[in-house]
Amino acid sequence: MPTVLIVDDAMFMRVALGNMLKEWGFEIVGEAANGKQAIEKYRELQPDLVTMDLTMPVMSGLDAVKEIIPEFPDAKIIMITALGQHRIIVDAIENGAKDFVTKPFTSENLKSVIDNVMRV
């Protein structure tokens, strides 16, 4: 069963993502509410997949990607972003994030992105 770390400052998003991912056969091994926690959890757990919100307090998802990828170049990180953050998303992809979804998104859209990232 593939493992996932869910990173989002909104508890309702972590719960919603967790429910979807469990339904698709993932094991939720950890959650984080900011980029700093995400780095710590990634180092500890080294999950198969990370869903990472872009805009969070303490440390952004982009800054977390910039710290995780040099240490773990094969990390599979999917960014979750609001509309209008495309320049930052390009920066995240250039720094090693594998793909992104834009809020609001459908479960089908998220599943398609996850399936593509997990195939690589």
Task: Give the predicted meaning of each segment.
Residues 83-84:
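Short, conserved "switch-loop" micro-motifs in signal-transduction and mechanochemical regulators
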Residues 11-30:
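Two-component/phosphorelay signaling modules centered on CheY-like receiver
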Residues 56:
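Receiver (REC) domain active-site loop signature in two-component systems and cognate sites
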Residues 87, 105-114:
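C-terminal output helix
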